[in-house]
């Protein structure tokens, strides 16, 4: 019999002695999601910062500025923080794809990624929902049984409202992408547990 060693190269992933696991599908999809998250949150921040308009009407000056609304301030802060997180996660995902080792390759780091993505997604949902409530009242007004009335605002500063609406849509897209990243981390944890048991 020949003593020539036989080398078996795994095609989809590998497991090492430290309960680490690498899957090219996870790494590639993680990098793509991080890039899209960074793009969506950056677009949300930039567009909201541009949401400023002043118009002169027969009733006087009508001004729409994001800084006049606490909900829009929180919106910008939340999206900016998530953008920084997504940018750092993109760098980590890029290094993981090259080195075939990353945060989704080990249980502790995969759990940390899962929790951070969950917190970031919750922050985006909170900020986008609050901003959406303000935007809807500004566009449609509100009448509560004739006692309290908020008149429509967007018929005077259309560009301001359109910009705010576009920023909110971008933020909700970022939330959806973060939700997918959370599911991806959960999938990686499932694969790690399966390979640890087998």
From Swiss-Prot:
It comes from the Eukaryota. Residues 1-30, 95-117, 187-198 are cytoplasmic. Residues 52-73, 139-165 are extracellular. The chain crosses the membrane at residues 31-51, 74-94, 118-138, 166-186. GO terms for cellular component: plasma membrane. Homodimer and heterodimers. This is CASP-like protein 1U1. It comes from Physcomitrium patens (Spreading-leaved earth moss).
């Amino acid at each position: 019999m020949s003593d020539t060693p036989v080398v078996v190269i795994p095609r989809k992933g590998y497991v090492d002695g430290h309960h680490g696991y690498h899957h090219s599908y996870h790494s590639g999809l993680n990098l793509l999601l991080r890039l899209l998250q960074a793009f969506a949150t950056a677009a949300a921040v930039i567009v909201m910062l541009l949401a400023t308009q002043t118009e002169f009407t027969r009733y006087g000056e009508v001004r729409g500025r994001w800084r006049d609304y606490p909900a829009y301030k929180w919106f910008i802060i939340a999206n900016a923080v998530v953008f920084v997180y997504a940018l750092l996660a993109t760098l980590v995902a890029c290094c993981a794809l090259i080195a075939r080792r990353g945060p989704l390759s080990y249980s502790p780091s995969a759990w940390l990624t899962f929790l951070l993505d969950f917190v970031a997604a919750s922050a985006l949902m909170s900020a986008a929902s609050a901003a959406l409530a303000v935007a809807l009242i500004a566009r449609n007004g509100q009448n509560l049984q004739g006692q309290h009335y908020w008149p429509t605002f967007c018929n005077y500063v259309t560009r301001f409202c359109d910009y705010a609406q576009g920023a909110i849509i971008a933020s909700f897209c970022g939330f959806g992408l973060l939700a997918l990243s959370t599911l991806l981390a959960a999938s990686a944890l499932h694969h790690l547990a399966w390979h640890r048991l087998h």
